[in-house]
Amino acid sequence: MKIGILSQFPQLYSTQRLVAACESRGHEAVVINTLNCYMNINSIKPSIHYEGQELVGFDAIIPRIHASVTFYGCAVVRQFEMMGVFVANDSISIARSRDKLRALQLLSRKGIGMPITGFANKPNDIPDLINMVGGAPLVIKLLEGTQGIGVVLAETKTAAESVIEAFLGLKANILVQEYIKESNGSDIRCFVVGDKVVASMKRQGPEGDFRSNLHLGGCGETVKITSVERKMAIAAVKAMGLVVAGVDILRSNRGPLILEVNSAPGIEGIEQTTGISVTEPIVEYIEKMVAARKTNRPIIA
């Protein structure tokens, strides 16, 4: 097969590992810079062009769309869909997961556990908003933030009011979320492919920081997840409509809670922590799905 990897960063560990996984299974892997694609949108033969050439002959696409280019990246993925190319994560699902508010509403609709979350537009709603999530301490998140950036822990009600007022004054969209103290600055990252959790790790934030993101200096360690956590991770991915995703879970006194579903999860951290390849299952899944499409067999994830 000819498999395209949509990524702005060809030298990134994640990109190189996907290339290696494709090639090790006898496929041709082509890294395509998402932002260098341009599209011919018509009703006869929609196409994508790249560096002066039309992109043709692709059997599948693995989207690795960076959060900063979600709008354009989803347009490119959507164009491949219109061309009949199989995509590991479709454009609608990527867009769903990138909109934190919409993602939480989808999880809520499916009855999947998550931290209590508030969303408001007017400064005069702040006191009730704070009470809604259980009071301080609480977490305030920018909707556009990624990798722990734009996430603030407000220790007191006064601090929470000040931070929320400041963000709303800047016309920023924010979520106000209950703080799960018992998680102690850690979470569980589950890497899901299809209907399977192929790897999982515990991430612990640096001392004094409640954020567990590895990009912010957190560390990872192997962990055995429970059957409930496994089922919840898979259910969260299905709620988004994704196939390949990273699911962040907090362990709380009332059971596991979904923090986030990431459509382009980091690969380096979880592979180096667990020693498990997460890229090979991605390629294996693509092989099965493309073969099923070609033979018109029922597709079983």
From Swiss-Prot:
Binds 2 magnesium or manganese ions per subunit. Mg(2+) 1 binds at residues 248, 260. One of its GO terms (cellular component) is cytoplasm. Gene3D superfamilies: 3.40.50.20, ATP-grasp fold, A domain, ATP-grasp fold, B domain. ATP binds at residues 141, 178-179, 187, 211-213. InterPro entries: ATP-grasp, ATP-grasp_RimK-type, ATP_grasp_subdomain_1, RimK, Rimk_N, Rp_bS6_RimK/Lys_biosynth_LsyX. Residues 104-287 form the ATP-grasp domain. GO terms for molecular function: ATP binding; metal ion binding; ribosomal S6-glutamic acid ligase activity. Keywords: ATP-binding, Ligase, Magnesium, Manganese, Metal-binding, Nucleotide-binding, Protein biosynthesis. Mg(2+) 2 binds at residues 260, 262. NCBIfam families: PRK10446.1, rimK_fam. This is Probable alpha-L-glutamate ligase 1. It comes from Shewanella sp. (strain W3-18-1).
